[in-house]
Design a protein with these regions (language model features):
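Short alpha-helix in the alpha/beta-hydrolase fold that links the catalytic acid
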Residues: 42-45, 145-146, 170-180
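Hydrolases whose catalytic domains are alpha/beta-hydrolase-1, hotdog thioesterase
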Residues: 117-121, 143
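Acidic catalytic loop of the alpha/beta-hydrolase fold
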Residues: 36, 141, 164-170
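Serine-hydrolase catalytic machinery in alpha/beta-hydrolase-like enzymes
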Residues: 2-105
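A conserved short beta-strand
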Residues: 127-140
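Active-site signature of alpha/beta-hydrolase-fold catalytic machinery across serine-
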Residues: 44, 120-124
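Gly/Ala-rich beta-loop-alpha elbow adjacent to hydrolase catalytic centers
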Residues: 109-114, 118
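Short beta-strand/loop motif that positions the catalytic acidic residue
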Residues: 154, 159-162, 166
């Protein structure tokens, strides 16, 4: 079976920016919005987190969602959207690196669906990053999904934030995410 064509999903969507121009920045914060939100809305965080020399980048999901179903659904159910979303984040990271910013100076952050996508991207592309900020999210897939990711985060700072009574994000998934990312 041929791989699904992901080029028409999230690729080509806008990439919003704030802060220092990428070519002049010493570091980057990639912000990933949640379902129903926009790149512009999450980029507003830059106003509350001003850091000289930091480029803030926010990719836009097609139709305001990175994938159609809950992050707890089987991975196949969210395809090909999930693969496209992960590829889009990878494109943004590559763009930042091409501007001369080392991975250790790149922080990925997200809220809700964006937090899930940021955590999944970092887990699948493990290396030393500047950090991971995941608010109200966790690794993608149902309970029992193999988490045999290769690589190591090598001391990447990770902040996972979530209510212990969130109706959409089980505390156990946040704890599992923390354990996987700590390996």
């Amino acid at each position: 079976m041929a791989a699904p064509d992901i080029s028409s999903l999230h690729q080509g969507q806008p990439l919003r920016a704030a802060g220092s121009p990428l070519a002049e920045a010493a570091g980057a914060l990639i912000l990933i919005h949640g379902r129903g939100a926009t790149a512009e809305s999450i980029l507003e965080l830059a106003d509350f987190l001003p850091q000289p020399g930091l480029a803030y980048l926010a990719p836009q999901a097609a139709n305001y969602a990175w994938y159609p179903y809950s992050f707890l659904e089987p991975l196949e159910r969210n395809e090909p959207y999930l693969s496209s979303a992960l590829a889009r984040v990878g494109e943004v990271v590559a763009r930042v690196e091409a501007a001369g910013i080392a991975p250790e100076r790149i922080v990925l952050g997200g809220f809700s669906q964006g937090a899930c996508l940021a955590a999944e991207f970092v887990a699948r592309n493990a290396r030393r990053y500047g950090g991971l900020l995941a608010f109200s999210g966790g690794l993608i897939g149902p309970s029992g999904t193999p988490r045999d990711y290769t690589g190591a985060l090598d001391g990447t700072p990770v902040l996972l934030g979530c209510s212990d009574v969130d109706p959409h994000i089980p505390l156990a998934r946040v704890e599992e995410t923390a354990a996987v990312l700590a390996r």
